[in-house]
A protein has these predicted regions:
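Bacterial N-terminal signal peptides that target proteins for export
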Residues: 2-8
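C-terminal motif of bacterial Sec signal peptides marking the signal peptidase cleavage site
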Residues: 18-21
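Aromatic sugar-binding surface patches on proteins
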Residues: 88-102, 213-224
Length: 279
């Protein structure tokens, strides 16, 4: 065969392989959604998070190997399969979804994780977190002039826009509520503030808000991602709500911080929608 013709056949074969199948992650490769985790939390020494894994076959094997980042010396991390029973090894939109759970412990003031290395189906796989995971240890508060009574600790990302989430507080002493916000990724939307069950306005209208000893305060709001941020309604988001207040006879502000875990997948419909979104 003419060398030029043979070389042309090689180029055509390589082009066909590239365009038809060799680079088709949706049919051939395992997908781990490292770009769909947003985690910035102030919490305890023990913490955890989830990633979603999509495979074209059931019974995916996963083993945690290591992680990289900042201040990770002494960090321990274990892998658990957190997949719900109703989607475990169930074919959805032609693929299978595994919810990867990671249980961590640190003695450091903060940890930042940039990547996680896993053994998936006997293949070493490095999962890059497009947004580094940041976990900061919560400092004990010496003031309880205002305390939390209710907050949504576990929610679903795809319910952000159609759910009014309640955040309740009780004032033991006279205080000024300075601000209410989320520490990262998201913002409150369509808020209503109630004092002793009476609506008094939105966050923008009434904060800073003076409250008296014995008052019950509730903030109802929807949640939305910050403008111009790249996210999906199937993103795992872990963050804190933060109420900043100033109690009488105190020289500094105090902050009430509560954990919020927003999961991407809560049922088979969510799992199928996530798989379709990544196709």
């Amino acid at each position: 065969m003419n060398k030029k013709v043979k070389y042309l056949y090689v180029l055509i074969a390589a082009f066909c392989c590239f365009t038809i199948g060799c680079n088709d992650k949706n049919t051939n490769d395992v997908i781990v959604t490292g770009d769909m985790l947003k985690y910035n939390r102030i919490g305890s020494k023990d913490f955890g998070f989830n990633l979603n894994l999509i495979d074209n076959k059931p019974d995916t094997t996963v083993e945690f190997l290591e992680c990289t980042g900042k201040n990770t010396d002494g960090l321990t991390m274990e892998y658990n399969d957190d997949t719900f029973e109703d989607i475990k090894n169930k074919k959805l939109a032609g693929r299978y979804l595994t919810i990867l759970g990671f249980v961590c412990h640190t003695e450091n003031d903060y940890v930042e994780i940039d990547s996680i290395t896993l053994n998936i189906n006997n293949k070493k796989t490095v999962v890059q977190l497009s947004t580094p995971l940041i976990h900061t240890l919560k400092k004990a508060s010496s003031d309880d002039s205002v305390y939390s009574t209710v907050y949504p600790s576990m929610i679903c990302t795809n319910s952000f826009s159609n759910t009014d989430y309640p955040f309740g507080f009780h004032a033991e002493k006279n205080a000024e509520l300075v601000s209410f916000e989320f520490n990262d990724f998201v913002v409150p939307q369509d808020s209503t503030v109630l004092v002793n069950q009476i609506p008094v306005g939105s966050l923008d209208d009434v904060f800073p808000l003076s409250v008296k000893s014995g008052d019950d305060i509730e903030i109802q709001c929807k949640i939305d991602f910050k403008p111009d941020s790249k996210n999906s309604k199937y993103t795992n988001v872990v963050f804190n709500s933060e109420l900043t207040y100033h109690a009488e006879n105190l020289s500094e502000n105090s902050v009430i911080s509560n954990d919020i875990f927003s999961q991407a997948v809560s049922n088979a419909d969510d799992a199928e929608a996530l798989i379709l979104e990544l196709k």
